[in-house]
Regions:
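Phosphate/anion-contacting hairpin/loop surfaces
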Residues: 1-199
Length: 199
C-alpha cells in the first residue's frame, strides 16, 4: 500500500512562493510549441521565507518548486529505516527563535501511475519533448503501477514531482512522531486528495 503525504491546514506557517530559491529556464518545443520549464537554482544557498500562522509545520509544500520538510521529519523517517531520502538544508531568511530547521527533500524513490488501470489515456503525445494531455482531469480511483516502483520508501510520482509518495513504514513513523501540519491520502485517492486524513 502506498500513501501520499500532503500539507495541513492554514493555521500553520507556509512557504512564500514568490520568494523561492528555485527559478526556471523556459523554452518552446520546436515540434509541438509547448513550453518546456527546467528548474534551476536562483541562489547558491536555498532560501525560503515563511508567512501565515503562528505554528511551524513539519511539512511545507511549494507545488512544483519542491517539497520542503522539517529536518525533524526527515530524521523521524531515517530512524524508522526509510530508504530513498536525499535532502539539502534550507535557510529561513525570516527565522525566529522557535523556527525549526527545514530541508529541501529530493525523493530517490520512484513509482508511476498505472494509466490503463486508472482509465486514463494519454493524448496529443509529443515524441520530441515527451509532453502529453490526459483524457480525464480527475481520474478516480488512481492505481499504482507496481512494476515501475524501484523499491524505495520515499518516492516521487511519475511526472508529478510535487507528490510525495511513501510506504506504510514512513506513514507509521510520521503518525508515531505526531508530525505537525501533515495529512495523507490512501492509494486510491493519490494525486487528487479527495479524502485527506490527519496524521
Amino acid at each position: 500500500m502506498f500513501y501520499e503525504i500532503r500539507g495541513g491546514s492554514g493555521r500553520y506557517k507556509y512557504f512564500n512562493g514568490e520568494n523561492t530559491f528555485l527559478g526556471y529556464e523556459k523554452s518552446a518545443c520546436h515540434a509541438c510549441g509547448r513550453v518546456i520549464a527546467t528548474p534551476k537554482y536562483s541562489a547558491e544557498t536555498p532560501e525560503i521565507e515563511l508567512d501565515g500562522g503562528k505554528k511551524y509545520p513539519d511539512y511545507l509544500h511549494a507545488y512544483t518548486r519542491g517539497i520542503i520538510l522539517s529536518k525533524r521529519a526527515v530524521e523521524v523517517f531515517l530512524e524508522a529505516g526509510a530508504t530513498g531520502i536525499d535532502y539539502t538544508p534550507v535557510v529561513v531568511v525570516n527565522k525566529e527563535e522557535e523556527t525549526p530547521e527545514y530541508v529541501w527533500l529530493k525523493p530517490q524513490g520512484f513509482i508511476d501511475i498505472d494509466y490503463k488501470a486508472s482509465h486514463i489515456k494519454k493524448k496529443n503525445f509529443c515524441a520530441e519533448c515527451g509532453q502529453f494531455e490526459l483524457n480525464r482531469l480527475r481520474p478516480c480511483p488512481v492505481k499504482m503501477a507496481l512494476a515501475s516502483w524501484n523499491g524505495l520508501d520515499v518516492c516521487r510520482l511519475g511526472l508529478y514531482p510535487h507528490c510525495l509518495i511513501v510506504t506504510e513504514k514512513v506513514l507509521a513513523a510520521a503518525k508515531k512522531a505526531k508530525l505537525k501540519g501533515m495529512t495523507y491520502t490512501e492509494e486510491g485517492d493519490i494525486l487528487y486528495a479527495l479524502k485527506n486524513k490527519k496524521i
